[in-house]
Amino acid sequence: MEGRIPLIGEEFPRVEVKTTHGKKVLPDDFRGKWFVLFSHPADFTPVCTTEFVAFQKRYDEFRKLNTELIGLSIDQVFSHIKWIEWIKEKLGVEIEFPVIADDLGEVSRRLGLIHPNKGTNTVRAVFIVDPNGIIRAIVYYPQEVGRNIDEILRAVKALQTSDEKGVAIPANWPSNELINDSVIVPPASSVEEARKRLESKDFECYDWWFCYKKV
């Protein structure tokens, strides 16, 4: 259904887009890499400007995680270019990641980025997509609230750690109030496994269903 929000665990819809770096096909052009697609309401607006600067300041950290950034709004490509030039000239920050020019709003509608009572501008959405093109996380912010880049980076790191180690990630990781930077071991699936887990020196446990370890 047009406008339906794609779901976590689904493949990111295949879309051909025009960007400030030329034409691209998502998710195909990012196969083998993670990518974060984030939409913003409009160019030449204060909150969006702070977000773009914040994303750029952390761009190297994303790339060290094999993760690319790509922005999107319902603006024409020349508007993106002029805004990026303004950011470089006035703020001394060069935006290095591509920005999708969705001037007709077709991609935004397909991804469910236009919400009721918000006109034709997109909300502040974040899609985290893995190297296989699967959507792993979706976050929506209202137009009035800028995003926290630390949390987006944390989510990417957490998903990658979960995939690599087969573990779950606690709240506020890696500074959790109970287990600090440890990760949660999946619960035991049998009585015998639960007993062995409590006796194991590989984990620390509050109980058989709540065990954790360092990674």
UniProtKB/Swiss-Prot annotation:
Organism: Thermotoga maritima (strain ATCC 43589 / DSM 3109 / JCM 10099 / NBRC 100826 / MSB8)
Family, as annotated: Belongs to the peroxiredoxin family. Prx6 subfamily.
Oligomer and partners: Homodecamer. Pentamer of dimers that assemble into a ring structure.
Pfam families assigned to the protein according to its UniProt record, in alphabetical order: 1-cysPrx_C (PF10417), AhpC-TSA (PF00578)
Function summary: Thiol-specific peroxidase that catalyzes the reduction of hydrogen peroxide and organic hydroperoxides to water and alcohols, respectively. Plays a role in cell protection against oxidative stress by detoxifying peroxides.
Reaction it catalyzes: a hydroperoxide + [thioredoxin]-dithiol = an alcohol + [thioredoxin]-disulfide + H2O
Catalytic residues, chain numbering: C48 (cysteine sulfenic acid (-soh) intermediate)
Domain Thioredoxin: 6-161
Further facts: The active site is a conserved redox-active cysteine residue, the peroxidatic cysteine (C(P)), which makes the nucleophilic attack on the peroxide substrate. The peroxide oxidizes the C(P)-SH to cysteine sulfenic acid (C(P)-SOH), which then reacts with another cysteine residue, the resolving cysteine (C(R)), to form a disulfide bridge. The disulfide is subsequently reduced by an appropriate electron donor to complete the catalytic cycle.
Name listed for the protein in its UniProt record: Peroxiredoxin
